[in-house]
Each structure stands twice: as C-alpha cells, then as structure tokens.
Amino acid sequence: PISGASISFPETTTLNFQSGIAEDTLLYGAIHQGKWSTAQIIVPENPNGINPATGAADALVSPIGSSFDDKIHYSIGVGRKVSDELALSISYAREDGGGALTSDPFTFRNGYDTYSVSARYTASENVTISAGYTYTTAGDVKVVHEAAPGVPSGLTLDYTDNSVSGFGFKIGYSF
C-alpha cells in the first residue's frame, strides 16, 4: 500500500428504454452518463525512494494522477423474434473520446464503437442455446509521460488501431 493514495468512484446516471416497433420486434437502448471528473486516482510522490511496484531502491518516484473526463455512452439495438424457437438481436454502442493526446497514465483509448449480434434458440421445453459476438474498435490515443507537471519526459505510449472481439456461447437447461 502507498500512504496517501486515493481513488474515488463516479456518480452515474443511466436511462434505459425499450419499445415494441412491430409485432415480435423490440427497439432498445440506453444513455449512460458517468461524472468521471469527480472520480480520480491519485498516487502521491514517494519520498522514501522505494519503488512500490518493485520494492527496490529507486529515484524519487513522481506523483501519478488521473485526469478523467465526464463521459456519455450511447447504445441502441433491435431484437426480433423470428419464430417460437429463434430470437435474434443486433446492437451498436458508442462513447466519444476526450482527445487524441493526454498525459493521463490511466488512459488507453479515445472513445470506442461497439457492434454486437446475438441469437437464442429454444431447442426444447427445457433446453436453450445462446450465442453472441461483439467487436469493439478503440479510438487512437497518445499518452505523453510527464517528468513533472507540464514537463514532458520524452516517453510516449501510442495506442493505435486497437480492437477487441468477444464471443460467448451458453447452453441452458431448466428442470
């Protein structure tokens, strides 16, 4: 543990909605706001010269702090009951970025776009099979390390052309 370190959590508000737009078709979505500007991570300067990550003697470790911005996340999707056995859905989600250049060491993306598809098949009265796929592209960001507040150290991290894919599969049995 580091003496004087602190972390706080954001105040959040979420508005979910859904509405039938045709027989067996559902439109759904959400707006999620996080007040991240009031929820920061702060690690103070380490005056004893011991690197808390390695436990080894080190030069004076600079203070580290986040500079999170307030964020709004939007999502929208459509679900369709194709038959008594099969239901499908597709959705899209987006969060705008806070800028392509930052000194915040906790920032690894500049917004994102997410695309998802899923299906649920009722094989029998007791068995369901569900599967889903999600693809997310993260916005590019360059993190510039500061040796002291406002003084670049020359160390930069480039997070570019990043994406993540996820797949889920479930077999459900009820009795």
Residue ranges and their predicted role:
Residues 1-175:
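Outer-membrane beta-barrel porins/channels
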